[in-house]
């Protein structure tokens, strides 16, 4: 017996209780785990294009807002220039350069941007318009290398996006949604390599072409970025609108709008702001907003940037995002690494103005409602589980007390009945003995 119960009954009942308690306990902890997981998820989820062996690029909700319009500047008829200057002890030397910007103009010849190295080195990168065509030219110590897009004129007053990439002596150029143009100069054996976009600060001067005929690749000690091309001695500066400027991680227009001390503006340059009007100088060019940017980086060093531009919004963006690739060594100072199978094509053409709209990320109200719903669900599950456990314990307590009481009452009654029966039996036996003795004595006296 165990607590007034038979041992077999107790074992069966305890097994049932254990199963039920285990089920509710598991349900309770599962609810807690669901609540913790839901609470730890980021409030903003980013979209990525999935390719083979993709490497995700995490984006902070506060810093990379690619769906918002960027700063736009208007360069007047008198010409103007926006200049960014690196600090003297922080001038980068790069093997890979990436440049992207959007503009609208009616000029047939104009300089869009020029990047120069420190005095005496002679390295430079220039993007300009020649007879209505976009031309990129650079020199990293060997000779001038040109790459030009002749299939489309850009001096029509419409908004155009230009993307340029340099990897050593190789280069790519893309205007709007046209095919990417690639340029591989002779004498360069590393036609498929992409290096790290920034090297530690040091004075890397490439004096002459090596004897083996290799193309020099380092853009040494970059000093200034001049946007607009205007100079006081010249009057043929850029005239029109320009937005979304990006160069090796620098968003110069946003920095200028924020009052960065390294950015200086001269001439006829003014900030339009976040919301750009549909009318532009010299004939009303239309500027579309790049509403979302999606990035994926593969192991073959292919970086994709996709734009969706709805026609009903007249905004621009300077959130053109890129990523560096492999092989951090310097061609001129360190043994070359193994060539990879990557390509130089780094961008996907933007979608047309009739592309589907991309839904924005959830606002604070939606996030707050979702958080409240999750909290309420967890609290409800926990409260229900606790109530079920209390009811089960109360039922066990009542059932146990009822069984023990009936058992003790029955036992006491059986004991009393047995004792009374024994006493009665003894009394009857004694009476029979005394009666027989008296009868015998009486008979004996009678006969005597």
Swiss-Prot record:
Broad class of where this protein is predominantly found: membrane
UniProt subcellular location: Membrane
Record has Transmembrane helix as a keyword: yes
Region (Disordered) location: 426-448
Basic and acidic residues composition bias: residue spans: 426-436
Boundaries of every Laminin G-like domain copy: 71-269
SUPFAM superfamilies membership: Concanavalin A-like lectins/glucanases
Keyword line: Cell adhesion, Membrane, Signal, Transmembrane, Transmembrane helix
Transmembrane segments: 376-396
Cytoplasmic compartment residues: 397-448
KW Transmembrane (keyword) present: yes
One Pfam family matching this protein: Laminin_G_2
InterPro entries: ConA-like_dom_sf, Laminin_G, Neurexin-like, Neurexin-related_CASP, Syndecan/Neurexin_dom
Database matches in Gene3D superfamilies: 2.60.120.200
Domain of life according to the entry: Eukaryota
One GO BP: cell adhesion
Region forming the signal peptide: 1-38
Protein topology in the membrane: Single-pass type I membrane protein
Entry GO terms, CC: membrane
Family assignment from sequence similarity: Belongs to the neurexin family.
Identification of the protein by name: Neurexin-1b-beta
